Amino acid sequence: YSLTGAQYTHISLAFDEDLSTLYSSTRKNGYTMFPAGPSREYLNRGVFLMRENIPCALYALEVTDEAYTRAKRRTQHMMHHGELYRFNSLGLLLCWMHIRWQRRRHYFCSQFVSEVLQKSGALELPKPSTLMHPSDYAELPELRCLYRGTLAGLPQRQSMELGEVESVMGLYLNVLLGAVKGRVRRLF
């Protein structure tokens, strides 16, 4: 937000109106930039708790049942097989400089959303996914704006029970436990 000057600097997908779970390629622990990759986000936890006065917009896209199913299936696959995917740090920098660069299984947030929407047949984009910025979505005529304001004012967030801001020690402990669980699962 303060670095790029753009009004919106992050984008996520949701498959339900209450926004209980958001999906993106972003920070995995909710606080620090790395580790990053395909992640589930929750409006009542992590960085969303710490930055509640940032600009926020909610858009709806009407899609066919088939496109919805394909988008959800693709997203769930990427979440379930998160170890196969990485955050596209270099691609993010190049996108900011308007340079197209594709890496297999590497995504930044708007590239992730763009790929899911495009490959599911839900939306045709005006430019390649590697050049889509979060703020570009505000300009797409297919999207209907449902809310524009601060994150704290988002109606779906106001109805949620807010979690506590975790300490950094607790955060890294949770990340470490998640990594250990992930390794154990792969052994069986």
Label the model's feature ranges.
Residues 1-188:
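Cysteine-nucleophile amide-bond enzymes
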